[in-house]
Amino acid sequence: MVESSRNAHLWIVGSGIAGMAVAAVAIRDAGIPGEHIHILEQLGIAGGSLDGAPSPKEYAGWVTRGGRMLEEEAYCATWDRFDSIPSLEDPAVSVRQEILDFNVRVPTHSNARLIDKNHEILNAAEYGFNTADRAELMRLLALSEKALGARRINDLFSEHFFQTNFWQMWRTTFASQNWHSATELRRYFVRFIQEFNRIHTLSGVRRTKYNQYDSLVVPLQNWILDHGVDVRFATRVTDVDFSDSAGSRRATSLHIDTDDGKSEIALGENDYTFITLGSITADTSFGSNDTVAPLIRDRVDRSWSLWDEISKKETDFGRPNTFYGNVDENKWESFTLTMHGDLLLKRIVEFSRNDPGTGALMTWVDSG
């Protein structure tokens, strides 16, 4: 550890998997003392989109807002990070090895990837491409991001492509909509091109043993806390001040809002800040069996409003409005089922011919 690392303080905005990974890498690879690392989180729980907590609306219910299907060819940084984080069940085994061992015992191979409106399982191995679809796919991959510009996916593909089995599987695996960015789709195609020939079974997926809050977030959180990291919940960062000198820009202070009032954290010469902006689960609202989740349109969540404030300072901080400007085209819904019996689980197993944990995703292609 060099002296500059010993004196450095890290201020991390957001306790999602990215923020906690920064803390863990700083301790493991840079030798920064855990006591010099501070995580500021507006919620009362860590994990970001991978959080897991009792439902605020439904008695005896549980909510996980997001999830991630891992695979061995991608997520290299994730595998590296969790290779040195001990499993909760067996500290002699890393979280990475626990996941890989679990997938040897419980491999993913969907037998019911697509279901039609007549409750029939479709032959998902038939992707449904015609010659025009293949040509349009090749054109998307061949074009540069500059050439694609602001075009949408439906600007690049004909209607037939959106009716193919391939698109039904791809869009429900990666949460793509026809009107989303063509550039974003191209990035996904390039990153996950190895999934093209197995997306009908999702056999490339590596699942965590339990939900990802318990299998990933909790072990990582425990590890950084054991190393002395300072985690502050209910702490909202509302703005960041910067200074520019000799062509170098650095953050100089963080504006903080807590239940106790407003304050500022001054950042010294040896301080660094890492900020998570624009979460896909920002402005989450909750419903129940009897109530509808309200739609939030005014960016209550700080991950977007903070980016708004920062972007006003310099144009190269990006344009967050590009992503949140049309709420109706970017909102999404999810459901977390809390079951107190196994009847539904047995029915799903009987219908899909997949034991629990082996089927990954089931898509009802006529559901909207």
Place the predicted regions along the sequence by residue.
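Beta1/beta-strand and adjacent pyrophosphate-binding region of the FAD-binding site
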Residues: 2-18, 38
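Short, solvent-exposed loop/turn and secondary-structure capping segments
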Residues: 49-52, 184, 284-289
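Conserved FAD-binding subdomain of flavin-dependent enzymes
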Residues: 59-99
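Rossmann-like flavin
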Residues: 88-194, 206
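Helical element adjacent to the flavin cofactor pocket in flavoenzyme catalytic cores
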Residues: 191-272, 277-278, 290, 296-300, ...
